[in-house]
């Protein structure tokens, strides 16, 4: 018979993971339908210019992530994790639904891309606090010796949400004529996001608040920037490799496979979906292993693999054969899966409990907003400028070098004392 503590822990996991799934489904589908959105909202004759414009709006959504991280991190440290998570999923659901209703440039003129940009900024504000708040939420409530696994579940929730978006995109691309998909079919996944958001909102709205028993700060962002800025910079450096590698591998490559290799949209999305599915077992396995062998060895291994393998993997990807394209992306998946699954636990463990949401959100989102959000745009621009389809690999190599140095500055935390909420520990003791 399950104990009351075990049931509560399971509900906490569901709230953290499932809400994250819903949030990242909403945010990911924009990247997957970037080509269609570019044609609807930007009146350029050149398809490359349309794609650059669509990814430019994508980047703006990311550039506001630090602001969203500061806002939602403040809510999490001041009023509790539940309030932060509920706010983020509600904002995402509403903005996603409205994107699905927006008229295109042919109907609304300049107002169409302006409105799209504003809604993407709302999404960026929401995502700025969502992932990091769920990381904190899950790791704080981990049973003893399971913080790595619980942090990996946060990453798995993200992966499953993006997988869901990719699968939905692949399904519509497979069954709809290209003209219908361009005209209106791309809107359906955005409209469906409202239903997913409502489910996530009520799931989080009803979960028990079990924040750590520490003094709530009135201005956590001020304390974070004044007293813990070194930690924020370290967390940002840690996130560089994840930001660049993830968004090259799973956002930019969907369009790259179509433009560089001539692979159809349906096949490009199928490749992405199959690759994303592998992240789930990899994440769980790596999370368990880091609780036994530590965080840093896996992080260092992933950055070294990214530096050495980026160019060869892009060379493999740059073939029209579907099997080779799939194998190339699977290589990136293994690297991202290892790194992304370890990252949540070490970030949360490194941050002081009284400003944990704010510190993790700022460190992670400064990097994801400035670097990750610009990565698809930078990759597309470099390819257009140089004519070299392999050049995005050098972005991954540079990011790997930066994060390798940042990792060395962190102490090993998997056996260090940790101030969490105690829900997971309580479940283990009951």
Predicted regions and their residues:
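Helix-to-loop junctions at the C-terminal end of transmembrane segments
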Residues: 69-80, 283-295
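C-terminal transmembrane helical hairpin of 12-TM major facilitator-type secondary transporters
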Residues: 297-342
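Extracytoplasmic gate region of multi-pass secondary transporters
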Residues: 31, 229-279, 372-376
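C-terminal ends and interior cores of transmembrane alpha-helices
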Residues: 90-109, 304-319
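Glycine-rich segments within core transmembrane alpha-helices of 12-TM secondary carriers
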Residues: 149-173, 196, 363-375
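Extracellular/periplasmic helix-loop-helix junction of adjacent transmembrane segments
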Residues: 34-67
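Cytoplasmic membrane-interface "Motif A"-like loop-to-helix N-cap segments
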Residues: 78-89, 292-303
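Multi-pass alpha-helical transporter architecture, strongest
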Residues: 200-205, 398-424
């Amino acid at each position: 018979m399950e104990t009351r503590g075990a049931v509560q822990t399971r509900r906490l996991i569901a709230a953290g993971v499932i809400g994250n799934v819903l949030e990242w489904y909403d945010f990911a589908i924009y990247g997957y339908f970037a080509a269609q959105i570019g044609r609807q909202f930007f009146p350029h004759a050149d398809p490359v210019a349309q794609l650059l414009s669509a990814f430019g709006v994508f980047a703006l959504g990311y550039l506001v992530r630090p602001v969203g991280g500061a806002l939602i991190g403040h809510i999490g440290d001041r009023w509790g994790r539940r309030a932060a998570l509920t706010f983020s999923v509600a904002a995402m659901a509403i903005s996603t639904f409205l994107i699905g209703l927006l008229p295109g440039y042919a109907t609304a003129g300049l107002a169409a891309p302006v409105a799209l940009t504003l809604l993407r900024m709302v999404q960026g504000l929401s995502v700025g606090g969502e992932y990091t708040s769920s990381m904190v939420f899950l790791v704080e409530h981990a049973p003893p010796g399971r913080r790595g696994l619980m942090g990996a579940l946060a990453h798995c929730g993200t992966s499953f949400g993006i997988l869901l978006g990719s699968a939905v995109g692949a399904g519509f691309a497979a069954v709809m004529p290209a003209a219908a998909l361009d005209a209106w079919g791309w809107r359906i996944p955005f409209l469906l996001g409202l239903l997913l958001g409502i489910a996530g909102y009520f799931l989080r709205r009803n979960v028990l608040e079990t924040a750590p028993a520490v003094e709530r700060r009135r201005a956590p962002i001020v304390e974070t920037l004044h007293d813990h800025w070194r930690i924020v910079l370290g967390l940002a450096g840690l996130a560089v490799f994840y930001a660049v590698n993830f968004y090259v591998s799973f956002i930019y490559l969907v369009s790259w496979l179509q433009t560089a290799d001539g692979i159809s949209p349906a096949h490009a999305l199928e490749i992405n979906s199959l690759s994303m599915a592998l992240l789930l077992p990899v994440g769980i396995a790596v999370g368990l292993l880091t609780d036994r062998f530590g965080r840093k060895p896996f992080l260092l291994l992933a950055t070294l693999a990214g530096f050495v393998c980026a160019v060869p993997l892009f060379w493999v990807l740059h073939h029209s054969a579907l099997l080779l394209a799939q194998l190339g992306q699977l290589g990136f998946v293994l690297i991202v899966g290892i790194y992304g699954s370890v990252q949540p636990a070490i970030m949360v463990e490194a941050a002081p409990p009284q400003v944990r949401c704010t510190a993790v959100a700022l460190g992670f989102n400064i990097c994801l907003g400035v670097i990750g959000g610009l990565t698809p745009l930078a990759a597309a621009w470099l390819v257009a400028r140089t004519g070299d389809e392999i050049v995005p690999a050098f972005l991954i190599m540079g990011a790997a070098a930066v994060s390798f140095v940042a990792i060395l500055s962190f102490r090993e935390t998997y056996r260090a004392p940790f101030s969490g909420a105690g829900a997971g520990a309580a479940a283990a003791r009951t």
